[in-house]
Regions:
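Ferredoxin-type iron-sulfur electron-transfer modules and their immediate structural context
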Residues: 1-133, 140-353, 404
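Residue-level marker for well-ordered alpha-helical positions
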Residues: 80, 137, 213, 366-367, ...
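Thiamine diphosphate
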Residues: 239-240, 339-419
Length: 419
């Protein structure tokens, strides 16, 4: 007889259920892979040069959290620690003129900025991305504020997502439409202020509660609009660039980090090559500017070549000069305007970052790292030191402390951490 049990074919949920307006690339390539249909895609859809657009992790909307953080605006001191510690950029802070919130949804929270660094009338909001949060609770643990009458209540508290999902989705959509506050008016050297800068690393596939990603996100907040990243293989290359999406994204002007992953052992040299290439392109662009000074205008040409670009204000001014230069090149009769136009963006100084874990920095890539450190070039090196090979399951590295138990050192590591 019949058992009466029906076995249904497994069905992948549609990743596009909550997404209505996506770029063609995401619709044609990314979403089918999300839905488990990557094997049906023709090779002709793949990028011929291997480059993929940024900002595609925002379309995943994984909805994996059972609870999400809820901001208590009355208790909050606006310290920014919840935003700083969030591994997935699922809590955002933004400063804006109070008038910008006149059409906000009724449940959208915002309060006057406590810092005297902002103009009168500036408001601040802390907003959760409910469908991108992993529910790890790092934000609650980081919050230093307790209600004196109820110590279990903080300025950020976890709450079940079900009754909040629709309203917080609407609140997030409004929050993201608010204009980004002037970067030049924000202090970059304090956590409360720096957390008001838009992150250009969001919604990665890193483990819930990851301790690595906040540092990468912070780097993108400070330098992301001109950032070149050489990423060693490991956790950071998996959550940073695994198909079909990337958490690196762009700002409102379309600028964001350029990210690439090369051989594990060659990452330091790879990043050094980015620095040398960026410097050479800048030198070449400056030479063309000097040659065309008569067409461009002597004052503009001199200002571009001698621009100080160590601070936000200098970078802002140089971007304005480059925009003006490109306008002039369109009308130029000089035989080389197209050539200069193709390299004009390199007149803006790039921030080169070499990123990897301790397995790369202490072990497999140490020789190259030592070589790069000994050279006088301007590179930034971020070592995500977890003291084991995290991506492959927790094996001992030379960063593992003496006596620590890890894979390959079950009896405790016999030697001290490499200095």
């Amino acid at each position: 007889g019949e058992s009466g049990i029906q076995v249904d074919e497994p069905h992948w949920p549609s990743a596009s259920a909550g997404v209505t307006d996506v770029p063609d690339f995401v619709r044609d390539l990314t979403l089918p892979i999300y839905q488990g249909h990557g094997d049906r895609l023709p090779v002709s859809l793949m990028p011929a040069d291997g480059t993929y657009p940024l900002g595609t992790a925002q379309y995943e909307k994984r909805n994996i959290a059972l609870e999400i953080p809820v901001w208590d605006a009355d208790l909050c001191t606006q310290c920014g620690k919840c935003v700083f510690l969030c591994p997935h950029s699922a809590i955002r802070a933004r400063a804006f003129d109070a008038a910008a919130a006149k059409d906000a949804p009724p449940t959208f929270k915002h309060v006057p900025a406590k810092s005297k660094d902002f103009p009168v009338g500036t408001h601040i909001s802390y907003q959760t991305a409910p469908e991108d949060c992993t529910g790890c609770g790092d934000c609650v643990e980081a919050c230093p504020i307790h209600d004196k009458s109820n110590v279990s209540r903080r300025a950020v508290n976890m709450a079940p997502i079900a009754p909040l999902l629709d309203q917080e989705r609407d609140n997030l959509a409004f929050f993201l439409r608010l204009p980004e506050f002037d970067r030049g008016a924000i202090k970059h050297n304090t956590i409360p202020s720096a957390m008001l800068l838009d992150p250009l690393f969001e919604f990665s596939g890193a483990c819930a509660g990851c301790g690595e990603t906040p540092y990468i996100r912070l780097a993108t907040q400070l330098f992301g609009d001109r950032m070149l990243v050489a990423n060693a293989t490991g956790c950071s290359s998996i959550y940073g660039g695994n198909l079909p999406s990337t958490p690196y994204t762009v700002n409102g002007a379309g600028r964001g980090p350029a990210w690439s992953n090369s051989l594990f052992e060659d990452n330091a040299e790879f990043g050094l090559g980015m620095r040398l290439a960026a410097d050479q392109l800048m030198i070449y662009a400056q030479q063309l500017v000097k040659e065309m000074a008569g067409e461009i205008g002597g004052d503009l040409a001199e200002a571009m070549v001698k621009a100080e670009q160590r601070e936000e204000a200098g970078l802002y001014e140089q971007r304005g000069r480059v925009a003006l230069l490109l306008e002039k090149l369109v009308a130029s009769n000089h035989p080389r305007p197209k050539e200069l136009a193709s390299v004009a963006e390199w007149l803006i100084r790039r921030s080169v970052w070499i990123i990897g874990g301790d397995g790369w920095a202490y072990d497999i890539g140490f020789g190259g790292l030592d070589h790069v450190l000994a050279l006088p070039y301007d590179v930034n090196i971020l070592v995500l030191d977890t003291e084991v090979y995290s991506n492959t399951g927790g094996q001992m590295s030379k960063a593992t402390p003496i006596g620590a138990v890890a894979k390959f050192s079950a009896g405790g590591k016999a030697t001290a951490k490499k200095d």
